[in-house]
Curated annotation (Swiss-Prot):
Cytoplasmic side: 1-10, 86-90, 143-153, 205-269, 326-331, 390-399, 451-496
Protein name as annotated: Solute carrier family 2, facilitated glucose transporter member 3
TM segment ranges: 11-32, 65-85, 91-111, 119-142, 154-174, 184-204, 270-290, 305-325, 332-352, 364-389, 400-420, 430-450
Primary residence: membrane
Regulation of activity: Deoxyglucose transport is inhibited by D-glucose, D-galactose and maltose. Galactose transport is inhibited by D-glucose and maltose.
């Protein structure tokens, strides 16, 4: 195999794809800053329509619906990934669903002019559908066009897009930018611009060569794209690996969601995929951001929103750090380090929150714990669950696996958002003990069950799971440790 290079074509394609990740992050964070203003809009709109102000219960319910329906859309969208990528391809799917982003952005951006709360809620649902689809499309596309030796580093760019989106939403949400009573519809409707930008750029990006060869049997086209993306003429080994996978796929029928759980060679990787997604959402990261503003205020920070933005900057910085570490330390190691560090920090947060009224310095200890907690999240549990799913499966089951994993992520996100406020009300600072328990459980699971995928081709990983499943069927034993001991594929020299 020839020396692979990080070419401008590869960087361009990955950058354009991560606009979808940015959209997910932006629309996740954008609703928080203008909460008070949007509640006033809902109150005024319903008062004008009904000639009487709505009850506090109705007002709170409509606001909660505006926030939560985004996750409902995400669940539906993420579960629909396979319907698009198998029919239209990876690139074309990203292009088509930008129609949803424009539609959702228009609904949200025009809801104030139309004096329609329904448009706001419908817009959040549609943009949730779009973001749910993006959480499947982007990691899949990046994983399939990246050289094996850099697949993890480029996969981390998906998470970088998400955290940059959240940070931009926090900054744009400041009152003197777009978070004012007059401009908040533009804040929500801004999502149209990245959609237009991505739609204009995607036609200049190649389709996934794996999709072209394995799904469409276009070997010559796939070969030319690989040569252009990787900057080498000798891609024969990669083409042969795809052809072998294509031959295996031709002997199998299309994999359904139920078959992921029924077939022994798919069962373990799909369980690993789901648990890793749960480890992200049940880590307590959203709870920490929920608490952060109040904690910063208690510590004497005059404008806690700026401290929250500071946490967002830490978020971004350590995602970049993870980008450089993931191909050196490996996915499994970084995920365990992240989970272990977060467990320690969540314990420290519980102690400092309980003692902050008695000891002045404890508020600052808690702030430090929050920032380090966020840093550990972005080292492992933030980026790794998104792209490792694409690594654990071959071309046939990959779309169904991405759909199941994405849906489990969105569902757990929805449940945490639904249940956390009540848990925080009844448990107070002790609520973080729950997350500590989850983190320790996920750490143990990762140690015993999750294989290292660094430096392995998709074919290597798939064959390892198949061998493990056959061995388990014969002996009744679990073969995970054998998989963890497999040597990575011979690494290709990669020039930047």
């Amino acid at each position: 195999m020839g020396t692979q290079k990080v070419t401008p074509a590869l960087i361009f394609a990955i950058t354009v794809a991560t606009i979808g990740s940015f959209q997910f992050g932006y629309n996740t964070g954008v609703i928080n800053a203008p909460e008070k203003i949007i509640k006033e809009f809902i109150n005024k709109t319903l008062t004008d329509k009904g000639n009487a102000p709505p009850s506090e219960v109705l007002l709170t319910s409509l606001w909660s619906l505006s926030v939560a329906i985004f996750s409902v859309g995400g669940m539906i969208g993420s579960f629909s990934v396979g319907l698009f990528v198998n029919r239209f391809g990876r690139r074309n799917s990203m292009l088509i669903v930008n129609l949803l982003a424009v539609t959702g952005g228009c609904f949200m951006g025009l809801c104030k002019v139309a004096k329609s709360v329904e448009m706001l809620i419908l817009g959040r649902l549609v943009i949730g559908l779009f973001c749910g689809l993006c959480t499947g499309f982007v990691p899949m596309y990046i994983g399939e066009i990246s050289p094996t030796a850099l697949r993890g580093a480029f996969g981390t760019l998906n998470q970088l897009g998400i955290v940059v989106g959240i940070l931009v939403a926090q900054i744009f949400g400041l009152e003197f930018i777009l978070g004012s009573e007059e401009l908040w519809p533009l804040l929500l409707g801004f999502t149209i611009l990245p959609a237009i930008l991505q739609s204009a750029a995607l036609p200049f990006c190649p389709e996934s060569p794996r999709f072209l060869l394995i799904n469409r049997k276009e070997e010559e086209n796939a070969k030319q794209i690989l040569q252009r993306l990787w900057g080498t003429q000798d891609v024969s080994q990669d083409i042969q690996e795809m052809k072998d996978e294509s031959a295996r796929m031709s002997q199998e029928k299309q994999v359904t969601v139920l078959e992921l759980f029924r077939v022994s060679s798919y069962r373990q990787p799909i369980i690993i995929s789901i648990v890793l997604q749960l480890s992200q959402q049940l880590s307590g990261i959203n709870a920490v951001f929920y608490y952060s503003t109040g904690i910063f205020k208690d510590a004497g920070v005059q404008e806690p929103i700026y401290a929250t933005i500071g946490a967002g900057v830490v978020n971004t910085i350590f995602t970049v750090v993870s980008l450089f570490l993931v191909e050196r330390a490996g996915r499994r190691t970084l995920h365990m380090i992240g989970l272990g560090g977060m467990a320690f920090c969540s314990t420290l947060m519980t102690v400092s929150l309980l003692l902050k009224d008695n000891y002045n310095g404890m508020s600052f200890v808690c702030i430090g714990a929050i920032l380090v907690f966020v840093a550990f999240f972005e080292i492992g549990p933030g980026p790794i669950p998104w792209f490792i799913v694409a690594e654990l499966f071959s071309q046939g089951p990959r779309p169904a696996a991405m759909a199941v994993a994405g849906c489990s992520n969105w569902t757990s996100n929805f449940l945490v958002g639904l249940l956390f406020p009540s848990a925080a009300h009844y448990l107070g600072a002790y609520v973080f003990i729950i997350f500590t328990g989850f983190l320790i459980t996920f750490l143990a699971f990762t140690f015993f069950k999750v294989p290292e995928t660094r430096g392995r081709t998709f074919e290597d990983i798939t064959r390892a799971f198949e061998g493990q499943a056959h061995g388990a069927d014969r002996s009744g034993k679990d073969g995970v440790m054998e998989m963890n001991s497999i040597e990575p594929a011979k690494e290709t020299t990669t020039n930047v």
